[in-house]
Amino acid sequence: PVIAPLVGGQLLLFTTWRVIFIILAVFSAILLLGSLLFRESLPKEKRVTGGLATATKNYFTLIKDKRFLGQSLIQFFAFGAFFAYISGSSFVYQNIFQLSAQEFSYLFGINSCGIILASAISGRVSNVVTSRQILTFSLWQLTIGSLLFLVAMIFEWPLIPVTTILFFTACTVSLFGSASFSMAMTKYGKMAGSASAILGFASMFAAGIVSPIVGLGGEHTGIPMGITMIVCAALSLL
């Protein structure tokens, strides 16, 4: 979701949107083939046995843990805010600020670089500050950024302030994502697969919910995007 708009914008210079869907179909076929040919690298003696029954038991064990459930909800709401940005930013840049698909992809690419940079910084400071501190800082940054973006949309701020706000807001995903995941997995190393599945489901489920909500107000307003972002960000703080 971060790199795809940048690549798609460049492809539109040479092709049409129909070709992009053909490329997606080809990549999907390659992934399907790869999944069929992929061989498990973990030695048999270290693999978790029990199949679906064990996995289901692990899921219930994890969900009953209030701390793990709390981190799952943080993933749900925080990624909800992030995917609201993913879903709505093209409308903001192209329909409100009248940028071309290529210009939008450049700005989106800059934000992607910011996300990578924030991830590198997070790794550097992880020995100095705790995961909880990183998580708290990033969620506050996400909330403040979302609020500023909503204000910017209401009062029709120009492009540069809006772009700056979205840059620092988008950077938080690599901070709260890794910190929350680390905190959730602390007690459940032996259930890493099940825990990772729940956390991944939480973030992707949020994406499925917020994406259509962002477009409810039409293509020429960013207010629904801002409202969705601030609501999700504020709930992640709870």
Which residue stretches match the model-derived regions?
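C-terminal transmembrane helical hairpin of 12-TM major facilitator-type secondary transporters
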Residues: Q133-A179
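Helix-loop-helix hairpin linking two adjacent transmembrane segments in secondary transporters
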Residues: P1-F38, Y106
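Juxtamembrane intracellular "pre-TM" segments in multi-pass secondary transporters
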Residues: S41-S72
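Pair of pore-lining "gating" transmembrane helices in MFS-fold secondary transporters
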Residues: K64-A84, F167-C171
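Interfacial helix-cap and linker-helix signal at transmembrane-aqueous boundaries
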Residues: L6-T15, Y93-Q94, V125-S126, I213-G222
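A late C-terminal transmembrane helix in Major Facilitator Superfamily
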Residues: S182-I223, T228-M229
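Small-residue hotspots at the loop-to-helix junctions and early N-terminal turns
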Residues: A101-G109, S196-A197, G226
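Helix-to-loop junctions at the C-terminal end of transmembrane segments
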Residues: A118-R132
